[in-house]
C-alpha cells in the first residue's frame, strides 16, 4: 500500500532525535520489534548509540519510518539499517532531503542502501560506489 493515500506527507512530522533519547525508544520500539519490519531490513536488527541521530517520520500516533545516521570518526554521516513503511518512495525522498540539508555542509554522506531503493537515492543526488547482491554503497555528491 502507499501511505500517501492514507496521510498527506506534508502534514507528517520528521523529528530529529539523539540516538539514546528516551523519546526515540518510545517512537520506534513498536516497529523495530515487529517481524515484518525486520524482514524488510533483510532480518538485520536495528541499533543505536550516542553517535547516532535518528530521523523519525510520524503523524498522530503512527510512526511511518526512520533513518538513523551515525557520525563516524572519519567525518562521515553514515546511513544504515533504515525503515520506510511500504517502501514509500515519496517518504524516502523526503527523509533523504532532510538528511542532506542537515549534514551536507560538514560531512560526507554515505549510505548502505537496499538495492530496491537505489534509484530513489540516485534521484536525490547519491552515486553508487560498490554493489552487492542486496545492497549498494552510495555517497551523496556535493557537485549536484
What is each residue range found by the language model?
Residues 2-41:
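Short amphipathic alpha-helix that is part of the acyltransferase structural core
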Residues 52, 132-137:
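Short hydrophobic/aromatic beta-strand or adjacent loop that forms the aromatic wall/cage
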Residues 75-87:
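Conserved acetyl-CoA binding element of GNAT-fold acetyltransferases
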Residues 103-115:
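Conserved GNAT acetyl-CoA-binding A-motif
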Residues 115-133:
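Conserved active-site alpha-helix within GNAT-family acetyltransferase domains
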Amino acid at each position: 500500500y502507499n501511505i500517501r493515500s492514507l496521510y498527506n506527507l506534508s502534514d507528517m512530522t520528521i523529528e530529529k532525535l539523539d540516538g539514546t533519547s528516551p523519546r526515540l525508544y518510545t517512537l520506534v520500539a513498536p516497529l523495530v520489534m515487529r517481524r515484518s519490519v525486520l524482514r524488510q531490513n533483510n532480518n538485520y536488527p536495528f541499533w543505536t548509540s550516542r553517535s547516532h541521530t535518528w530521523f523519525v517520520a510520524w503523524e498522530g500516533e503512527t510512526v511511518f519510518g526512520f533513518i538513523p545516521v551515525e557520525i563516524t570518526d572519519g567525518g562521515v554521516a553514515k546511513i544504515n539499517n533504515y525503515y520506510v513503511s511500504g517502501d514509500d518512495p515519496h517518504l524516502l525522498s523526503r527523509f533523504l532531503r532532510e538528511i542532506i540539508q542537515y549534514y551536507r555542509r560538514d560531512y560526507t554522506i554515505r549510505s548502505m542502501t537496499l538495492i530496491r531503493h537505489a534509484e530513489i537515492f540516485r534521484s536525490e543526488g547519491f552515486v553508487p560506489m560498490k554493489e552487492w547482491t542486496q545492497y549498494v554503497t552510495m555517497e551523496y555528491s556535493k557537485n549536484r
